[in-house]
Amino acid sequence: MTDDLLEENVPEIPEGYTRMNWFQGFGRQIGPMYERVNADKTYTRAFLVSEAHTNGMRNCHGGMLMAFADMALGHAISLQENRYWVTVRMVTDFVEAAKVGDWVEGTGVITGQEDDIFTVTGRIWCGDRTVMSATGVFKALGVRPPRRKA
């Protein structure tokens, strides 16, 4: 079946977003993911909730939101420090559901650092609704090579 590849099924992506070049491994399973670099050099990551992301109530599955929060918050270290990172701990608060068709966005800000350990606070939202708040502790690893353009 190729109905998911037809042009009329491709969702409209908000202006300023580009599809992330993450087509292998876990990214292939949960994507596609999108990213926008804002005028103030901050970033926003996003995804469109599809049927594949839902639980039995047709809400975006909490595990999907947690995986997305991990990528959205951890990216603050990639962007600011130009380093790879791994998650040490993530605390999430689910505030409201995201439904099929919702455009989910998220970002994070580094709020603390001790040696190679960073604390990042972030928010996940749909429009004006907060879906999740999160705080993550991440360990920075080696320096990242420059990103290739897709």
What are these regions (language model features)?
Residues M1-A150:
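Terminal targeting signals and extreme-terminal segments of soluble enzymes
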